[in-house]
Each structure stands twice: as structure tokens, then as C-alpha cells.
Amino acid sequence: MEVTQTVKSYRIKKIEEIGKMTALSQEEIISNTKTVIQGLDTLKNEHNQILNSLLTSMKTIRKENGDTNLVEEKANILKKSVDSIELGLGEAQVMMALANHLQHTEAEKQKLRAQVRRLCQENAWLRDELANTQQKLQMSEQKVATIEEEKKHLEFMNEMKKYDTNEAQVNEEKESEQSSLDLGFPDDDDDGGQPEVLSPTQPSAMAQAASGGCEIPARLRTLHNLVIQYASQGRYEVAVPLCKQALEDLEKTSGHDHPDVATMLNILALVYRDQGKYKEAANLLNDALGIREKTLGPDHPAVAATLNNLAVLYGKRGKYKDAEPLCKRALVIREKVLGKDHPDVAKQLNNLALLCQNQGKYEEVERYYQRALEIYQKELGPDDPNVAKTKNNLASAYLKQGKYKQAEILYKEVLTRAHEKEFGKVDDDNKPIWMQAEEREENKAKYKDGAPQPDYGSWLKAVKVDSPTVTTTLKNLGALYRRQGKYEAAETLEECALRSRKSALEVVRQTKISDVLGSDFSKGQSPKDRKRSNSRDRNRRDSMDSVSYEKSGDGDEHEKSKLHVGTSHKQ
């Protein structure tokens, strides 16, 4: 009976514990289950010991022929209790196995959740990468389209460059730049302004440059001509010693502070300039300036010419800040001596505007160019080449400031004026090239399926307008059209500029042939006839008045900025 009561008590306790387990955590349930297993295992051992004791008692009673019914009943009860205990142990072990399985399942679930989170993050990252890649692809396609257009433009510029031979440069200089120069600096545009690849100054330019507006003294004329000849041939090893020997002789006979010494210093400065020795040339010009100020006075035109030449030289060395006050002083002298509306004042204003432009002083640049433009239009007329050149310079300044509309207006004015001068008043049947280029741009979509566009025959004849300024304007306006996305209009102007350059070079070749034939013919002329012919050539040269100073700084095909170094126009 004691065993039965013990089993009942254990079962009641077990039921109570199981009831409590429903409110326990998983760890507490596992801990309690382990405790129950230990208790059941102990109880099983106790029951087995009691059962073994009863079985031994039964054997003893049977030997004595006693009554074993009571003992057998107890033994049966104990066997049932042991079976129940074993069942409980099995259930507890199953619960432990289930608990372990649940723990493993929970761990797997947490692992899967972590993988899901990681996959979600990777998915979000991949979406971002896809969006970025699509954006980059779109930008790349846009860049490819832009590069293709730039490639076409560069191919055009390469075609233009093929015709920019040294022969063409020399002849263009003769046509547009052999004027009365103070120092006669040649065009640096074709070599990028690099002193190591400078070409010699033209003889006529050097001749005018040497004197700075003063007549060459008779005693220096022969030496002067020799130096010019050697320097123009690039034979500086002969020209420089000649100049130095002449300087030494002049200083011995006349002293250092003599106008003739200043003239020879100018000649030597020009030779040094052609060699790219800008520092030595500047020192000589400063010396010449001091002599002329002492001997001729601070407000003499020759002083203004030397100041201007020195400013040009500083500009070529990139010393724009040092060049500006020299240029301003030259402007003041020329205004005082020549008057505020003289063309040489306009030249000086152009120089000053360019120096300010290289320093980013665009308000002053616009003011100087506009005043120069007013002077040229008033004194020389709207068809003078200087008007178109100054408009180009002003347009270049507008471009550097991003004022594309104002620049476009000026370029169109230049082309319209050149067209009217060549072909008459503009009307529906006589349109300048820029109008026809814009018509092509507007009609591009209409003929995009391969249908041929109308043949604009009139713009082909406009190619005959072969002024260097007009050709430059065509290229600049074409570059502006490209910036605006008007590629058809840009290609039209570029083709026109290319044809114009080819036409101009053909004229140059024919002129050279004529000059050679004329030279042979002049041998048979009388001195009077030769003098008349030389006078015509000189007048043709003197009609031009600018020297290229540097390329446009922003990389576009803008107007090559001009820095004039001219002496006074005759009033």
C-alpha cells in the first residue's frame, strides 16, 4: 500500500509540474524535464529494489509452503508501477528529443531569417547598382553622341589644318598683317605661341618696327637693311653681332642717350624676339624707352610705340598685369597726340581689351572693344576690315562670359555685312550663309529619312568671300552652333569655311606665281615703272593693320584674339 501511495503522490506531483510547465519558458521546461527524468530514474531503481526484495520473499515463502498471495499482489503492483515509470521516462526522453529538435529548428529558422535579411540587403544593393548602371549607360550614350559630333568637328579642323601650311601663313601675314608696325611681332597662332618654334619676322614688318615711327637715319640705313635681311632668313648668328657692333659704334660716337641708339636697340630687340629671347628683348626695349623719353619727351608718338611694343612683349610672356599699365599709358599719349577718335587709338584700345580679357576683366574688355568699334565705324566706315575684326574680338569676349546670344548676333552681323558687300542687299533670294545654315537645321527633320535636301547653290557662291576674318567668323559661329546642338548648321558653316580656305590658298598660289613672273618682268621695266609698282604693293600692305597675339583661351574655335602693334595712321 505504501508503494501505491508513493506512485499516486508522484503522479500528482508530475501532473502539477506539467501544469506549471505551460507557463514556463522553453529553457525552464527542459530543465524541469531533466529533473523529472532523474527523479523517475531514481524511483525506478527503488521500485526495482523493492520488487527484487518481494520476489526473494516469495521464493522463501514457497519453500516454507506459506501463503504468497499478498506478496504476489504487491509484486504485481510494483511491476505496474515500474512499467508506468518506464513509460514516463520514455515520454520524458521523447520530450527532451523534441526539445532538442525544436532548438535545432529554431536555430535553423534564425539562420534562414539571417539569410533572408542578407538577401533583402543584397537585392536592395543590386537594385541600386542596376539604377546606377542604367544611369551611367544613359550618360555614356549621351557622351558617345557628343564624342561623335566632336569627332566630326575635329575631322573638319584636321582638314583645315592640312591647308594651314607655312606658305599660307606667310601669305596671310602679307595680306592682313604687314602694316606700319612698332615692333613687328609675327603671328604666333600656328605654333601655339611656343617660342622655340617661332618663325622669323617678315622683312617689311621689321623695317617698320625698327624705327618705332621715326625715320631711319642715313648712316644706319645700310646696316639696318643688312640686319633685316639676315634676321628674315633666320641667320641670327650674323644679325646679332652686326647689331651689337653697331650699338657699340653708335655709343662711342653719339653717346648712349641718342635716338639712333634707341632705333638700334629696337632692331636688336626684334631679333631677340624672333629667337624667343623675350627677357633680353624686354630689357632692350626698356632701355630704348628711357632714351626716347629723355630725347623726344614723354608724350612723343615714338614713346607710345615703344610702350605698346613692350606691352605686347609682356603679354607674350603671360605678364598681363605688367603689360596693362604700359598699354594704358600708350593709349593716353596717342589720345593726346592724335585725338580720341583716331584709328591708332582704336588699335590701342583693342590691345588693352585683350590684356584685360586675359585677366578676366570682362566689363573693361567690353567697354574698350565697343569704343574701338565706334571709332573704326566712324573714321573708316562700316566696311573696313577692322570693324569685322573688332566685332569678332568682342564676340570672343562674350563667349568667354557665356553670353552666347550677344556673340551670335555679332558673328551674324559680320557675315551679313560681308555678304551684302559681295552680293548685294539681303532678300529671300539672296540670303547670307548663316540664314541658309539655319534653314538646313530647321529642315533636317523633314529630310531625315534619306531624301536629299534642296541644293543651296547660293551658299556655295558665298565661299568666294575669302576674307580671313570672314573665314574665322564662319568657324566661330559653327562652333557656337555645335554648342547649341545645331549640328547641321555647324557642318554647313564649317564646309563653307573649308571651301573658303581652299579658295584662298589657290589665290595665294596664283599670286605667288604672278609675283615670280612679275619679278622677272620687272627686270625689263624702267626704274619709273618699278617705282610705281612698288608703291602699289606698299599701299596694299599698309591697308592691313593687325598682328595676331594669341589663341582664344577656352579651347573653342573662337576668333583668334588680335593684339595690334601698329604705328600711327597718317591724319
UniProtKB/Swiss-Prot annotation:
Residue ranges the record marks as coiled coil: 54-160
Region called Disordered, residue ranges: 167-210, 518-571
Major place of residence: cytoplasm
Cell compartments where the protein resides: Cytoplasm, Cytoskeleton
TPR repeat start and end residues: 220-253, 262-295, 304-337, 346-379, 388-421, 471-504
Record key words, sorted: Coiled coil, Cytoplasm, Cytoskeleton, Microtubule, Motor protein, Repeat, TPR repeat
Subunit structure: Oligomeric complex composed of two heavy chains and two light chains.
Family affiliation: Belongs to the kinesin light chain family.
The protein's name in its UniProt record: Kinesin light chain
Organism: Doryteuthis pealeii (Longfin inshore squid)
